[in-house]
Amino acid sequence: MVSRHDPSFMNAMQISIQSLRPNEELWKAHKRQLTDPWVGPGASRHKDMITEATNKLIDNWIDKDEVEFVSEFAMPLPQIVMANIIGFPLEDIPLHKKWGDAMVMPFVYGKGHRNLLTKEQTNEQRALLTEFTDYVVDKVTEKRKNPQEDMISFLTKVTYEPFDRKLTDHEIVGVAYAMIIGGLETTQYAIAHQAQMLVDDPELYVELNNDRNKINAFVEESLRVRAPTQGLSTRMTTQDEFFQGVKVPKGSILHLRYGAANVDPDEFECPHQVNLDRKALTRHLTFSQGHRTCPGNGISRLEQNIAWNCLMDRIDKFEFTQNTQIEYQPGIMLGTLELLLKFRRL
């Protein structure tokens, strides 16, 4: 048993990546065996759970005239879904939120192309991530003794085929870390963006409500136009270059922007418009492409589709209120912090 004070837990996801998926072939195996059955192609197993969670959230505010859409719907939905999938108690969701915020601190408050935190911020993040590690290790211990139908229990039992062995505590913590950092805020922001887009275009809301088969196309187009993660990676130029008429000197730091690629007019006709008939709707880079495509894209897409089907079952129209003020999270994430809406029930 690894000590809960082992500092190597501090970067559990990075350790897990180095151990379980350091190259392309192992990355594919990791997805295929460890995450695909839960949040990838196998995400459909959670359809009933997501539908129930969605309707319960709507129940909480359906009899009101207004809803703060982020805190009362877009945020708690992926929190509930991911807790159920991983096998964490729902009453611990405030803790998961706290630790999830700690995980993304560099992307929100970090400075420079390396997203560096101050010494104080780094110490705060390390303390919070140590709490997360201790929490997951305790859950892993519980699941080994009393396995349930959840992802942590599965990870304690599975034999990882490339290495023909069981996963270590370190590696399970790393997988759980990836599920939290990748499965909460991104889906939250996507659903909130979609609400804004539908309020801005009420005719589109009517069109989707009348033909629910179009909701999936809308989800893909909204993910393309308003990617929750605008970019992550940076590169340094090794020589002077000109890019679209702009001189880029040697040694310049470039930020790779998925959000910009998604609205490239050379790739997408009328790129800023939602086109439900657009060919190759999933061609955008919001979940990346290739063997490193986001492992949780299946569960995120499912949540978004179910969310809007359930909302349209019960809501005839959403509108902004006189007090609606839209502010976005700083950093590389395109995230709406608050979205006050009024609505008309069916």
Where are the language model's segments positioned?
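Cytochrome P450
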Residues: 1-346
